[in-house]
């Protein structure tokens, strides 16, 4: 049995100390890191509970339950941040990416502890693939929220649409992973390639301007 709450405490403890020592400008980054790992921990409990209640098999839990729960849990702190602090667009995007990054990091650490780290090539591809998938979902949601929350009429519909887009991409990724074989490595490569393509497009647009 993997006691993920103990892992959470071990990882978060130095982050809390660092957050107290750093200035106010860096505090936001550490807080969103802690929040991202916290929602990952809560997502694991909720996924397990819903899988037991629905009597879902491994495939259903991975492709149907986990993407919905995890993307909703990652969205909730961002909505709270938007409602309470009303941040600027660039801060929303940075917060979404930080939460997604911390979520992916904690998920990868728990996976390594539970399954071992002896297969370097597999762990390498999984680390990049899972990290890029969560970051890409964060980019979708964060970039979209920065746009939709500037327009009152788009807030609710836009947020729901962005959440559905992130869930769909996450579910597709998990489904390919669960299928195994070549599809698994396609899943690992897909988010990395999409992030790279997005950054290249952004760079070309900035060069034209």
Provide a role label for each language-model segment:
Residues 1-209:
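Hydrophobic alpha-helical segments at protein termini of multi-pass membrane proteins
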């Amino acid at each position: 049995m993997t006691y993920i709450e103990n892992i959470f405490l071990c990882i978060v403890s130095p982050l809390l100390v660092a957050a107290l020592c750093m200035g106010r400008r860096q505090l936001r980054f550490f807080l969103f890191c802690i929040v991202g790992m916290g929602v990952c921990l809560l997502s694991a409990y909720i996924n397990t509970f819903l899988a037991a209640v629905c009597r879902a098999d491994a495939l259903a839990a991975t492709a149907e339950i986990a993407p919905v729960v995890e993307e909703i849990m990652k969205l909730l702190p961002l909505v709270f941040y938007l409602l309470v602090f009303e941040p600027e667009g660039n801060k929303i995007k940075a917060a979404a990416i930080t939460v997604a990054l911390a979520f992916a990091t904690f998920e990868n650490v728990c996976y390594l502890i539970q399954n071992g780290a002896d297969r370097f090539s597999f762990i390498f591809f999984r680390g990049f693939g899972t990290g890029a998938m969560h970051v890409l979902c964060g980019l979708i949601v964060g970039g979209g929220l920065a746009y939709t929350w500037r327009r009152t009429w788009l807030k609710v519909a836009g947020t729901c649409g962005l959440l559905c887009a992130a869930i769909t991409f996450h579910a597709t990724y998990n489904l390919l992973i669960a299928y195994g074989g070549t599809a698994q490595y396609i899943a690992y490569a897909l988010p990395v390639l999409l992030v790279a393509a997005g950054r290249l497009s952004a760079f070309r647009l900035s060069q034209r301007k």
